[in-house]
Amino acid sequence: MGGSAPPDSSWRGSLKVSYNVGPGFTGNFSTQKVKMHIHSTNEVTRIYNVIGTLRGAVEPDRYVILGGHRDSWVFGGIDPQSGAAVVHETVRSFGTLKKEGWRPRRTILFASWDAEEFGLLGSTEWAEDNSRLLQERGVAYINADSSIEGNYTLRVDCTPLMYSLVYNLTKELKSPDEGFEGKSLYESWTKKSPSPEFSGMPRISKLGSGNDFEVFFQRLGIASGRARYTKNWETNKFSGYPLYHSVYETYELVEKFYDPMFKYHLTVAQVRGGMVFELANSIVLPFDCRDYAVVLRKYADKIYNISMKHPQEMKTYSLSFDSLFSAVKNFTEIASKFSERLQDFDKSNPILLRMMNDQLMFLERAFIDPLGLPDRPFYRHVIYAPSSHNKYAGESFPGIYDALFDIESKVDPSKAWGDVKRQISVAAFTVQAAAETLSEVA
Protein backbone atom coordinates (compact mmCIF):
# COMPACT_ATOMS: atom_id res chain seq x y z
CA MET A 1 0.00 0.00 0.00
CA GLY A 2 0.97 3.61 -0.45
CA GLY A 3 0.57 6.52 1.90
CA SER A 4 2.41 7.11 5.15
CA ALA A 5 4.29 4.60 7.28
CA PRO A 6 2.52 2.98 10.23
CA PRO A 7 2.65 5.07 13.41
CA ASP A 8 3.84 2.23 15.61
CA SER A 9 5.94 -0.93 15.23
CA SER A 10 3.05 -3.03 16.52
CA TRP A 11 1.30 -2.30 13.22
CA ARG A 12 4.05 -4.12 11.27
CA GLY A 13 3.89 -7.81 10.53
CA SER A 14 6.54 -10.33 9.44
CA LEU A 15 6.13 -10.05 5.67
CA LYS A 16 8.72 -8.21 3.62
CA VAL A 17 6.42 -5.30 2.78
CA SER A 18 6.25 -1.68 3.93
CA TYR A 19 2.95 -1.95 5.86
CA ASN A 20 2.05 1.61 4.89
CA VAL A 21 -1.46 2.63 5.88
CA GLY A 22 -2.63 4.08 2.54
CA PRO A 23 -4.45 5.46 0.77
CA GLY A 24 -3.73 3.87 -2.59
CA PHE A 25 -1.01 1.53 -3.76
CA THR A 26 2.62 1.81 -4.88
CA GLY A 27 4.77 0.59 -7.75
CA ASN A 28 3.18 -1.79 -10.22
CA PHE A 29 0.00 -1.80 -8.17
CA SER A 30 -0.59 1.97 -8.29
CA THR A 31 -3.04 1.78 -11.19
CA GLN A 32 -4.77 -1.42 -10.17
CA LYS A 33 -8.16 -1.67 -8.52
CA VAL A 34 -9.50 -4.08 -5.95
CA LYS A 35 -12.78 -5.79 -6.74
CA MET A 36 -14.86 -6.83 -3.76
CA HIS A 37 -17.71 -9.33 -3.72
CA ILE A 38 -20.13 -8.68 -0.87
CA HIS A 39 -22.64 -11.33 0.12
CA SER A 40 -25.37 -10.01 2.43
CA THR A 41 -28.24 -11.94 3.94
CA ASN A 42 -31.60 -10.20 4.03
CA GLU A 43 -33.94 -11.45 6.71
CA VAL A 44 -36.88 -10.21 8.73
CA THR A 45 -35.96 -9.82 12.40
CA ARG A 46 -38.00 -8.78 15.41
CA ILE A 47 -36.88 -5.52 17.04
CA TYR A 48 -37.57 -4.34 20.58
CA ASN A 49 -38.22 -0.87 21.90
CA VAL A 50 -38.17 -0.40 25.67
CA ILE A 51 -40.44 2.33 27.06
CA GLY A 52 -40.49 3.47 30.68
CA THR A 53 -43.19 5.77 32.05
CA LEU A 54 -43.12 8.20 34.96
CA ARG A 55 -46.72 9.33 35.27
CA GLY A 56 -47.34 13.02 35.74
CA ALA A 57 -49.10 14.21 38.87
CA VAL A 58 -51.07 17.13 37.39
CA GLU A 59 -51.13 16.69 33.61
CA PRO A 60 -50.61 12.97 33.01
CA ASP A 61 -51.92 13.34 29.44
CA ARG A 62 -48.99 15.55 28.44
CA TYR A 63 -45.85 13.67 27.41
CA VAL A 64 -42.20 14.71 27.53
CA ILE A 65 -40.01 12.07 25.88
CA LEU A 66 -36.31 11.32 26.40
CA GLY A 67 -35.21 8.77 23.82
CA GLY A 68 -32.09 7.27 22.30
CA HIS A 69 -31.18 4.08 20.49
CA ARG A 70 -29.17 1.17 21.90
CA ASP A 71 -28.38 -0.85 18.76
CA SER A 72 -24.91 -0.38 17.29
CA TRP A 73 -22.93 -1.54 14.29
CA VAL A 74 -20.18 -3.09 16.39
CA PHE A 75 -19.35 -2.30 20.05
CA GLY A 76 -20.82 1.20 19.91
CA GLY A 77 -18.55 2.74 22.54
CA ILE A 78 -19.63 6.22 21.48
CA ASP A 79 -22.57 5.59 19.15
CA PRO A 80 -24.86 4.88 20.91
CA GLN A 81 -23.65 3.65 24.30
CA SER A 82 -22.33 7.02 25.46
CA GLY A 83 -25.90 8.23 24.98
CA ALA A 84 -27.56 5.12 26.42
CA ALA A 85 -25.47 5.50 29.58
CA VAL A 86 -26.77 9.05 29.99
CA VAL A 87 -30.36 7.86 29.57
CA HIS A 88 -29.82 5.17 32.23
CA GLU A 89 -28.32 7.66 34.69
CA THR A 90 -31.10 10.15 34.01
CA VAL A 91 -33.70 7.45 34.66
CA ARG A 92 -31.90 6.50 37.87
CA SER A 93 -31.89 10.14 38.99
CA PHE A 94 -35.59 10.60 38.35
CA GLY A 95 -36.21 7.27 40.07
CA THR A 96 -34.42 8.53 43.17
CA LEU A 97 -36.64 11.62 43.20
CA LYS A 98 -39.73 9.45 42.84
CA LYS A 99 -38.70 7.31 45.82
CA GLU A 100 -38.57 10.52 47.83
CA GLY A 101 -42.19 11.25 46.93
CA TRP A 102 -41.70 13.53 43.91
CA ARG A 103 -43.59 13.26 40.66
CA PRO A 104 -43.30 15.50 37.60
CA ARG A 105 -46.19 17.72 36.64
CA ARG A 106 -46.36 16.04 33.22
CA THR A 107 -45.69 12.43 32.23
CA ILE A 108 -42.13 11.56 31.23
CA LEU A 109 -41.52 8.72 28.77
CA PHE A 110 -38.05 7.17 28.65
CA ALA A 111 -37.38 5.33 25.40
CA SER A 112 -34.65 2.92 24.31
CA TRP A 113 -35.00 2.52 20.55
CA ASP A 114 -33.96 -0.50 18.53
CA ALA A 115 -32.82 -0.61 14.87
CA GLU A 116 -31.81 3.04 14.57
CA GLU A 117 -28.84 2.09 12.42
CA PHE A 118 -31.17 0.32 9.99
CA GLY A 119 -33.09 3.48 9.11
CA LEU A 120 -34.51 4.83 12.40
CA LEU A 121 -36.89 1.88 12.41
CA GLY A 122 -37.57 1.53 16.14
CA SER A 123 -38.50 5.13 16.85
CA THR A 124 -40.35 5.57 13.56
CA GLU A 125 -42.53 2.48 13.96
CA TRP A 126 -43.35 3.37 17.57
CA ALA A 127 -44.23 6.96 16.68
CA GLU A 128 -46.36 5.83 13.76
CA ASP A 129 -48.20 3.33 15.97
CA ASN A 130 -48.86 6.06 18.53
CA SER A 131 -49.17 9.02 16.18
CA ARG A 132 -52.68 10.01 17.24
CA LEU A 133 -51.74 10.05 20.92
CA LEU A 134 -48.51 11.91 20.26
CA GLN A 135 -50.18 14.54 18.09
CA GLU A 136 -52.66 15.25 20.87
CA ARG A 137 -50.37 14.86 23.90
CA GLY A 138 -46.72 15.24 22.87
CA VAL A 139 -45.04 18.25 24.48
CA ALA A 140 -41.41 17.68 23.54
CA TYR A 141 -38.87 15.10 22.45
CA ILE A 142 -35.24 15.20 23.65
CA ASN A 143 -32.89 12.97 21.68
CA ALA A 144 -30.19 11.04 23.51
CA ASP A 145 -27.88 9.44 20.98
CA SER A 146 -24.09 9.76 21.32
CA SER A 147 -23.19 12.04 24.22
CA ILE A 148 -19.83 12.92 22.69
CA GLU A 149 -18.34 13.35 19.25
CA GLY A 150 -15.40 15.30 20.67
CA ASN A 151 -14.36 17.01 23.90
CA TYR A 152 -14.11 20.66 22.86
CA THR A 153 -17.47 22.29 23.60
CA LEU A 154 -21.23 21.82 23.77
CA ARG A 155 -23.28 21.39 20.62
CA VAL A 156 -27.05 21.89 20.57
CA ASP A 157 -29.55 21.46 17.74
CA CYS A 158 -33.16 22.29 18.57
CA THR A 159 -36.35 24.07 17.65
CA PRO A 160 -36.25 27.84 18.30
CA LEU A 161 -38.94 27.27 20.95
CA MET A 162 -36.21 25.75 23.14
CA TYR A 163 -33.53 28.42 22.67
CA SER A 164 -34.32 30.28 25.88
CA LEU A 165 -34.63 27.03 27.83
CA VAL A 166 -31.17 25.94 26.70
CA TYR A 167 -29.59 29.34 27.36
CA ASN A 168 -31.03 29.58 30.87
CA LEU A 169 -30.12 26.00 31.74
CA THR A 170 -26.50 26.24 30.57
CA LYS A 171 -26.05 29.45 32.56
CA GLU A 172 -26.78 27.41 35.71
CA LEU A 173 -24.38 24.54 34.93
CA LYS A 174 -20.64 24.53 35.55
CA SER A 175 -18.36 24.25 32.54
CA PRO A 176 -16.21 21.09 32.44
CA ASP A 177 -13.72 22.72 30.07
CA GLU A 178 -10.13 23.43 31.04
CA GLY A 179 -9.50 27.15 31.48
CA PHE A 180 -13.12 27.81 32.42
CA GLU A 181 -13.00 26.70 36.05
CA GLY A 182 -15.65 28.51 38.06
CA LYS A 183 -17.46 29.66 34.92
CA SER A 184 -20.74 28.51 33.47
CA LEU A 185 -21.25 26.12 30.60
CA TYR A 186 -22.94 28.98 28.75
CA GLU A 187 -19.75 31.07 28.99
CA SER A 188 -17.41 28.37 27.66
CA TRP A 189 -19.91 27.40 24.97
CA THR A 190 -20.28 31.02 23.81
CA LYS A 191 -16.52 31.55 23.79
CA LYS A 192 -15.72 28.39 21.85
CA SER A 193 -18.74 28.25 19.53
CA PRO A 194 -20.19 31.75 19.08
CA SER A 195 -23.33 32.28 17.05
CA PRO A 196 -22.61 33.67 13.58
CA GLU A 197 -25.87 35.67 13.68
CA PHE A 198 -26.36 36.77 17.30
CA SER A 199 -23.48 38.55 19.03
CA GLY A 200 -22.58 37.35 22.51
CA MET A 201 -24.61 34.15 22.23
CA PRO A 202 -23.62 30.52 21.51
CA ARG A 203 -24.38 28.74 18.28
CA ILE A 204 -27.51 26.60 18.10
CA SER A 205 -27.93 24.63 14.88
CA LYS A 206 -30.98 23.55 12.93
CA LEU A 207 -32.30 20.02 13.31
CA GLY A 208 -31.57 17.91 10.24
CA SER A 209 -32.14 14.18 10.23
CA GLY A 210 -30.27 10.90 10.51
CA ASN A 211 -31.42 10.35 14.07
CA ASP A 212 -34.45 9.33 16.10
CA PHE A 213 -35.89 12.82 16.54
CA GLU A 214 -36.80 12.81 12.84
CA VAL A 215 -40.27 11.28 13.08
CA PHE A 216 -41.21 13.39 16.10
CA PHE A 217 -40.09 16.72 14.69
CA GLN A 218 -40.26 16.41 10.91
CA ARG A 219 -43.43 14.35 10.67
CA LEU A 220 -45.48 14.95 13.83
CA GLY A 221 -44.42 18.51 14.67
CA ILE A 222 -43.37 17.84 18.26
CA ALA A 223 -40.84 20.36 19.59
CA SER A 224 -37.48 18.58 19.66
CA GLY A 225 -33.86 19.09 20.61
CA ARG A 226 -30.57 17.34 21.24
CA ALA A 227 -27.27 18.14 22.94
CA ARG A 228 -23.82 16.54 22.99
CA TYR A 229 -20.17 17.45 23.35
CA THR A 230 -18.42 18.05 20.06
CA LYS A 231 -15.03 18.74 18.51
CA ASN A 232 -13.52 22.00 17.27
CA TRP A 233 -15.03 22.19 13.80
CA GLU A 234 -12.62 24.95 12.79
CA THR A 235 -9.56 22.73 13.16
CA ASN A 236 -11.14 19.30 12.62
CA LYS A 237 -13.06 19.73 9.40
CA PHE A 238 -13.66 16.03 8.77
CA SER A 239 -17.20 14.81 9.33
CA GLY A 240 -18.03 12.64 12.32
CA TYR A 241 -15.20 11.42 14.51
CA PRO A 242 -12.30 8.98 13.98
CA LEU A 243 -13.21 5.28 14.34
CA TYR A 244 -16.93 6.06 13.89
CA HIS A 245 -18.96 2.85 13.43
CA SER A 246 -15.79 0.76 13.42
CA VAL A 247 -14.64 -2.21 15.48
CA TYR A 248 -12.32 0.19 17.34
CA GLU A 249 -15.19 2.28 18.74
CA THR A 250 -15.02 0.76 22.22
CA TYR A 251 -15.34 1.71 25.87
CA GLU A 252 -11.54 1.97 26.00
CA LEU A 253 -11.63 4.61 23.25
CA VAL A 254 -13.89 6.76 25.40
CA GLU A 255 -12.08 6.12 28.67
CA LYS A 256 -8.55 6.69 27.36
CA PHE A 257 -8.97 9.40 24.76
CA TYR A 258 -12.29 11.22 24.81
CA ASP A 259 -13.46 11.52 28.38
CA PRO A 260 -11.23 9.80 31.00
CA MET A 261 -13.05 11.45 33.92
CA PHE A 262 -16.48 11.22 32.21
CA LYS A 263 -16.98 14.90 33.00
CA TYR A 264 -18.35 15.63 29.53
CA HIS A 265 -20.81 12.77 29.86
CA LEU A 266 -21.94 14.26 33.16
CA THR A 267 -22.41 17.69 31.59
CA VAL A 268 -24.44 16.27 28.71
CA ALA A 269 -26.55 14.31 31.20
CA GLN A 270 -27.20 17.53 33.12
CA VAL A 271 -28.23 19.35 29.94
CA ARG A 272 -30.50 16.60 28.65
CA GLY A 273 -31.90 15.76 32.06
CA GLY A 274 -32.34 19.43 32.90
CA MET A 275 -34.30 20.03 29.72
CA VAL A 276 -36.57 17.08 30.46
CA PHE A 277 -37.07 18.25 34.05
CA GLU A 278 -38.01 21.79 33.04
CA LEU A 279 -40.29 20.66 30.24
CA ALA A 280 -42.05 18.17 32.50
CA ASN A 281 -42.23 20.23 35.66
CA SER A 282 -42.59 23.93 34.76
CA ILE A 283 -46.04 25.32 35.41
CA VAL A 284 -45.83 27.28 32.15
CA LEU A 285 -44.05 25.46 29.35
CA PRO A 286 -40.54 26.94 28.89
CA PHE A 287 -41.09 27.75 25.21
CA ASP A 288 -40.47 31.23 23.82
CA CYS A 289 -42.31 31.89 20.56
CA ARG A 290 -40.45 35.20 20.10
CA ASP A 291 -37.29 33.27 19.24
CA TYR A 292 -39.21 31.59 16.44
CA ALA A 293 -40.18 35.02 15.12
CA VAL A 294 -36.55 36.11 15.03
CA VAL A 295 -35.34 33.10 13.05
CA LEU A 296 -38.31 33.19 10.68
CA ARG A 297 -37.27 36.69 9.62
CA LYS A 298 -33.68 35.54 9.21
CA TYR A 299 -34.72 32.52 7.15
CA ALA A 300 -37.04 34.63 4.98
CA ASP A 301 -34.21 37.09 4.26
CA LYS A 302 -31.87 34.21 3.42
CA ILE A 303 -34.18 32.49 0.95
CA TYR A 304 -35.07 35.83 -0.64
CA ASN A 305 -31.39 36.61 -1.17
CA ILE A 306 -30.92 33.21 -2.81
CA SER A 307 -33.79 33.91 -5.20
CA MET A 308 -32.35 37.32 -6.07
CA LYS A 309 -29.44 35.60 -7.78
CA HIS A 310 -31.98 35.35 -10.61
CA PRO A 311 -33.39 38.92 -10.82
CA GLN A 312 -34.47 38.68 -14.45
CA GLU A 313 -36.42 35.47 -13.89
CA MET A 314 -38.00 36.93 -10.76
CA LYS A 315 -39.32 39.78 -12.88
CA THR A 316 -40.30 37.63 -15.85
CA TYR A 317 -42.34 35.19 -13.78
CA SER A 318 -43.73 37.85 -11.39
CA LEU A 319 -42.21 36.24 -8.32
CA SER A 320 -42.70 38.06 -5.02
CA PHE A 321 -41.86 37.28 -1.41
CA ASP A 322 -44.20 39.99 -0.08
CA SER A 323 -46.72 37.47 1.24
CA LEU A 324 -44.02 35.60 3.18
CA PHE A 325 -42.54 38.75 4.68
CA SER A 326 -46.04 39.92 5.62
CA ALA A 327 -46.78 36.60 7.34
CA VAL A 328 -43.48 36.76 9.24
CA LYS A 329 -44.27 40.32 10.33
CA ASN A 330 -47.69 39.24 11.58
CA PHE A 331 -46.16 36.26 13.39
CA THR A 332 -43.66 38.57 15.10
CA GLU A 333 -46.35 40.96 16.31
CA ILE A 334 -48.70 38.22 17.52
CA ALA A 335 -45.86 36.33 19.24
CA SER A 336 -44.88 39.50 21.09
CA LYS A 337 -48.45 40.07 22.29
CA PHE A 338 -48.76 36.42 23.31
CA SER A 339 -45.58 36.70 25.39
CA GLU A 340 -46.99 39.75 27.15
CA ARG A 341 -50.17 37.87 28.02
CA LEU A 342 -48.06 34.95 29.20
CA GLN A 343 -46.43 37.17 31.82
CA ASP A 344 -49.68 38.56 33.19
CA PHE A 345 -52.32 35.82 33.13
CA ASP A 346 -53.69 34.18 36.28
CA LYS A 347 -51.65 31.00 36.66
CA SER A 348 -53.90 29.79 39.46
CA ASN A 349 -56.72 29.40 36.92
CA PRO A 350 -56.25 25.80 35.68
CA ILE A 351 -58.38 26.27 32.56
CA LEU A 352 -56.53 29.40 31.49
CA LEU A 353 -53.17 27.80 32.29
CA ARG A 354 -54.01 24.76 30.20
CA MET A 355 -55.15 26.95 27.32
CA MET A 356 -51.94 29.00 27.26
CA ASN A 357 -49.77 25.89 27.51
CA ASP A 358 -51.71 24.25 24.69
CA GLN A 359 -51.07 27.25 22.46
CA LEU A 360 -47.35 26.85 23.14
CA MET A 361 -47.40 23.08 22.72
CA PHE A 362 -49.31 23.12 19.44
CA LEU A 363 -47.29 25.92 17.84
CA GLU A 364 -44.74 23.48 16.40
CA ARG A 365 -47.62 21.39 15.02
CA ALA A 366 -48.86 24.46 13.15
CA PHE A 367 -45.78 24.32 10.91
CA ILE A 368 -46.69 20.84 9.66
CA ASP A 369 -48.11 20.45 6.15
CA PRO A 370 -50.04 17.15 6.01
CA LEU A 371 -49.20 16.85 2.29
CA GLY A 372 -45.48 16.95 3.02
CA LEU A 373 -42.72 18.47 0.94
CA PRO A 374 -42.67 17.88 -2.83
CA ASP A 375 -41.42 14.34 -3.53
CA ARG A 376 -40.73 13.93 0.22
CA PRO A 377 -44.12 13.17 1.84
CA PHE A 378 -42.62 11.99 5.13
CA TYR A 379 -40.99 15.38 5.69
CA ARG A 380 -43.86 17.68 6.63
CA HIS A 381 -42.28 20.57 8.53
CA VAL A 382 -42.50 23.68 6.37
CA ILE A 383 -39.78 25.59 8.23
CA TYR A 384 -37.23 22.80 8.72
CA ALA A 385 -36.28 19.65 6.86
CA PRO A 386 -33.12 17.72 6.13
CA SER A 387 -31.27 19.11 3.16
CA SER A 388 -32.06 17.18 -0.01
CA HIS A 389 -28.32 17.10 -0.61
CA ASN A 390 -27.15 16.20 2.93
CA LYS A 391 -29.62 14.31 5.11
CA TYR A 392 -27.75 15.08 8.33
CA ALA A 393 -27.88 18.86 7.80
CA GLY A 394 -30.97 20.99 8.34
CA GLU A 395 -32.39 23.44 5.81
CA SER A 396 -34.80 26.33 6.38
CA PHE A 397 -37.87 26.85 4.17
CA PRO A 398 -36.90 23.58 2.45
CA GLY A 399 -39.77 23.65 -0.03
CA ILE A 400 -38.63 26.97 -1.49
CA TYR A 401 -34.96 26.04 -1.25
CA ASP A 402 -35.41 22.76 -3.12
CA ALA A 403 -37.47 24.47 -5.82
CA LEU A 404 -34.70 27.05 -6.33
CA PHE A 405 -31.84 24.56 -6.27
CA ASP A 406 -30.12 24.27 -9.66
CA ILE A 407 -33.12 26.01 -11.22
CA GLU A 408 -31.10 27.38 -14.14
CA SER A 409 -30.64 23.85 -15.49
CA LYS A 410 -34.34 22.90 -15.38
CA VAL A 411 -35.82 21.81 -18.72
CA ASP A 412 -39.03 23.83 -18.32
CA PRO A 413 -38.22 27.21 -16.68
CA SER A 414 -41.86 28.27 -16.54
CA LYS A 415 -42.84 25.17 -14.58
CA ALA A 416 -39.76 25.45 -12.35
CA TRP A 417 -40.49 29.04 -11.37
CA GLY A 418 -44.15 28.13 -10.94
CA ASP A 419 -43.02 25.56 -8.37
CA VAL A 420 -41.05 28.25 -6.54
CA LYS A 421 -44.09 30.52 -6.49
CA ARG A 422 -46.22 27.67 -5.14
CA GLN A 423 -43.77 26.93 -2.33
CA ILE A 424 -43.65 30.61 -1.35
CA SER A 425 -47.44 30.48 -1.01
CA VAL A 426 -47.26 27.32 1.12
CA ALA A 427 -44.68 28.93 3.41
CA ALA A 428 -46.60 32.20 3.72
CA PHE A 429 -49.85 30.40 4.50
CA THR A 430 -48.19 28.17 7.08
CA VAL A 431 -46.45 31.01 8.93
CA GLN A 432 -49.65 33.07 8.97
CA ALA A 433 -51.69 30.09 10.19
CA ALA A 434 -49.13 29.42 12.92
CA ALA A 435 -49.38 33.04 14.01
CA GLU A 436 -53.15 32.74 14.33
CA THR A 437 -52.77 29.84 16.78
CA LEU A 438 -51.09 32.31 19.17
CA SER A 439 -53.82 34.91 18.88
CA GLU A 440 -55.93 35.69 21.91
CA VAL A 441 -58.82 33.27 22.13
CA ALA A 442 -62.13 35.01 21.46
Curated annotation (Swiss-Prot):
Binds 2 Zn(2+) ions per subunit. Required for NAALADase activity. Zn(2+) 2 binds at residues 79, 117, 245. It is an enzyme of class 3 (hydrolase). Keywords: Cytoplasm, Dipeptidase, Glycoprotein, Hydrolase, Metal-binding, Metalloprotease, Multifunctional enzyme, Protease, Zinc. GO terms for molecular function: dipeptidase activity; metal ion binding; metallocarboxypeptidase activity. Its EC number is 3.4.-.-. Ca(2+) binds at residues 125, 128. It holds the Pfam family Peptidase_M28. Belongs to the peptidase M28 family. M28B subfamily. This is Putative N-acetylated-alpha-linked acidic dipeptidase.
